[in-house]
């Protein structure tokens, strides 16, 4: 194996922002934007974009499709293991770098991959029929450091494996990207309108007045009955908590990229993303990190506990204080923290798993959340894929104990979750990884936009309050769709 294999990294100057540049490539196949749209001093420091992958890996059940240019190959096996093997040849050594992602795989793992991590029933309807995972592998990415206000091109030269050829290709790809950036700075006046960021005044001026119907996969009565059924399972000792969700669908009357611009304007989030993949376009504004790996350090940040934002400062303060001091919400958060500690303990060194933040209040444009942070150090020989298999899917969106909670989810939710509550993010050539929990996210397929919202049910839960909480979590998504003042919610 070649040692000391590094990428080429060059700082560049551009007059356009990351969202504006992505607007110029958003309609290209396999274009992506991993967008940190919040305070750059904390979680919103870096954004990444790119297109033209040299390798695409997607899976349906145990059938894995591998695309290299015009060549298509089908393999069979566990998708997690196959993805790990396919990425293994493309490795970079760790080196000092200005950004954490130096090229690699970008894409999604759907919740339905849980059938490869646990033995579970599968009775819910798979009506969206999307691949259960899809990762595109990029040799060149454009990175933004929002704190330092710098931009970088990272070029790796893959899939070339011979070192001289790899570096030659890396230099060529770097120069191509610089030429593209120069061209955009010259012609941005032609391309910029509608490509980048959207302010509140522009958002309001574009507000549509027509009525749009949201269709749920639950009737309100069915959702209430399902909440109470979960409470019965809890009373019987089956579980402590179950995350129950409902999915909405609406006809999409704007482009997916326009929807992304609107969602970014109304709900900037630290773990947002846009994936323009052939079978689905994903627009995410997730506030939650599932797993971050940097060298051997692992971090997960489960979110559990929600209140809507108030209409004024006094109401805002009251709701924030109510959430902070809610025994129910803190108990939910603690249950999930214990679950995540156990999951990390399966692959981390003994004594390294620690809770560094417990149920701290975080403020978002439409809601308050309670968030905790759990960290650990991976055991020698454990890969990021091993970690993913041990912890997937995230405990904050299943319940506890995890396996029984997932069995109940399959029983009570009428349709498969697909990408919802799975993960979006990157797996780097240097084996670093950062992936979110897919919440506050649109799945766009064949002219329809789907989004799913839910909450953690415990014995003390009030069914009607839980139903309302799902609507609170949908506020930013509904506003991004720019629905009419009269929003009609219809049952399935």
Language-model regions: role of each:
Residues 1-492:
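Extended alpha-helical targeting/anchoring segments
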